[in-house]
Amino acid sequence: RVLFRSIRKDNLMLWMTGEEWSKVLDISLNGFFNVTQPLLKNMLVKRYGRIVNIVSLSGIQGMPGQANYSAAKGGVIAATKALAQEVAKKKVTVNAVAPGFIRTDMTEGIDENEWKKHIPAGRFGTPEEVADLVGFLASPASSYITGEVISINGGLYT
């Protein structure tokens, strides 16, 4: 099971509305619970499962104008780590993938040429690169990896 449901409602905290805050947290953080919790029992009974949450570089380092998005993704990261400890003995792994700048609708409107200057790899990532990482984490080959947040960001760090 891979969870990726997200929206951005970027705004400086000073100008952010309660609705902008709540909507982002509801979709990302509550979405994690609402999708994951109903699937757990079956995974635990079968003694096998892979849960891969898609988070964000923003959830690791925070981004100005994205306090709501950063908080939501940071919350999913913390929940990933906690849940991994709860279910590891039943051979269920729980990990998160934290993409940086990936060419998707989430990065539309961002000046790619400007941001590429800050990325050591010199480019935005592709959805296929993220999918390859998710595929590995969903495979039997990743059975000893759990509770981890794996960044896929071309070397972009704080």
Regions found by a protein language model. Name each.
Residues 1-3:
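Short, small-residue-biased leader/transition segments that mark boundaries at the very start
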Residues 11-13, 20-22, 51, 107, ...:
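Substrate-binding pocket helix/loop in short-chain dehydrogenase/reductase
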Residues 14, 61-67, 89-90, 122, ...:
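Active-site loop immediately N-terminal to the catalytic Tyr-X3-Lys motif
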Residues 36, 72, 80:
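Active-site helix of classical SDR
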Residues 40, 48, 124-152, 156-157:
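C-terminal substrate-recognition "lid" of short-chain dehydrogenase/reductases
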Residues 41, 85-89, 143:
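Alpha-helical segment proximal to the catalytic Tyr-Lys
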Residues 56:
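Residue(s) in the substrate-gating loop at a strand-loop-helix junction
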